[in-house]
Amino acid sequence: MGKYFGTDGVRGEANVELTPELAFKLGRFGGYVLSQHETERPRVFVARDTRISGEMLEAALIAGLLSVGIEVYKLGVLATPGVSYLVRTEKASAGVMISASHNPALDNGIKFFGSDGFKLADEQELEIEALLDAKEDLLPRPSAEGLGALVDYPEGLRKYERFLVTTGADLDGLKIALDTANGAASVSARNVFLDLNADITVIGENPNGLNINDGIGSTHPEKLQDLVTETASDIGLAFDGDSDRLIAVDENGAIVDGDKIMFIIGKYLSEKGLLAKNTIVTTVMSNLGFHKALDSCGIHKKVTAVGDRYVVEEMRQFGYNLGGEQSGHVIIMDYNTTGDGQLTAVQLTKIMKETGKTLSELASEVTIYPQKLVNIRVDNSMKERAMEVPAIAEVIAQMEGEMAGNGRILVRPSGTEPLLRVMAEAPSNEEVDYYVDTIAAVVRAEIGLD
């Protein structure tokens, strides 16, 4: 990670850390870096989620892009993967999404996509950071006809919706509960599933700028679980603020997380001979039960660091077409170049329809090991160096010794927040509590801020 860019773009508290001034510079410098080799006038697509700070940052970012002669297509509220899709299919120079994904409304973020629809390489981010830190802005300042023009492009949303529908199946007879997190999916998910002939009920569809992800969406699926059982729905689908992830709920109200979703889609593709190299790419956070289920089906796996960008890098480098995270980021490379919650939802419901199986039946092959994750607030300067603290390293080694191979421990820094995450898996909840609580107590004593 760089000084400004984390694992998912630039993030911070809106108007405090991520200011309009910084957004202007990101537009100006980011736009320049991504379009400096264009032979024609560059075009950049810009979208946002529903946060109250979105329009403020959008205006500043667009001003920066226009100031270096870039033509800006303003998409309005749209899911992050919609930007990625449109950049590729409309042959734009780049795309920019203004969102902090699953974070609360006070935060916001800015992430860039290259002309290929993928997030930026580290080298490009470092080039932008060098311009941000330069003592003087020496980039061109065109005037008159050299300035960029702003184009409102609401039809981008409709094109993305039509794309999603073309990948699905007729869902007539399927009852679906949707939770759009008062976020970007609130403008599209209803339309997509109605076009697929599903019988739908929707919550989290009334954004006011402040209620995005607020007790709702993929990080808070409790309301959706209640809705599924109350309406006797066949499946519940919960998206996060920018709709790049999906958490599902089965007909009994039980959570079906990213691991189980990847298994269901992966097994379906494998049985049809469509899973590239018969392999799924996942991260170190995936549950042991997921790995065991893949082994039982003869499906291979590749494991990366946490973060969908690392999953995508592995997929691109070795030609895999399915990967993702337990948190619900699922990348289906045959269709899109980034995690896409609505696309994943369309594929999951298509599999239910084609197989005639309930979601609980499809997910039953994955027996999840009890897992506990604790987030401990630490100084940003310490979260990357926690393992250098002798007491922390010692307690982790002690707990791993007690596990004797029947479980695992993962201690890692958050890529976007000042947190150290302590996770353990073991055969019983009691064992998990013991391992996590013991390690967390030492971390708090040594470097915790609470």
Curated annotation (Swiss-Prot):
The modification Phosphoserine is found at S101. Gene3D superfamilies: Alpha-D-Glucose-1,6-Bisphosphate, subunit A, domain 3, Alpha-D-phosphohexomutase, C-terminal domain. Coiled coil: none annotated. Activated by phosphorylation. Keywords: Isomerase, Magnesium, Metal-binding, Phosphoprotein. The gene is glmM. It comes from Streptococcus equi subsp. zooepidemicus (strain MGCS10565). The lineage of its organism: Bacteria, Bacillati, Bacillota, Bacilli, Lactobacillales. GO terms for cellular component: cytosol. GO terms for molecular function: magnesium ion binding; phosphoglucosamine mutase activity; phosphomannomutase activity. Mg(2+) binds at S101, D240, D242, D244. Its cofactor is Mg(2+). Belongs to the phosphohexose mutase family. It is an enzyme of class 5 (isomerase). It catalyses: alpha-D-glucosamine 1-phosphate = D-glucosamine 6-phosphate. This is Phosphoglucosamine mutase. The active site is at S101. Its EC number is 5.4.2.10.
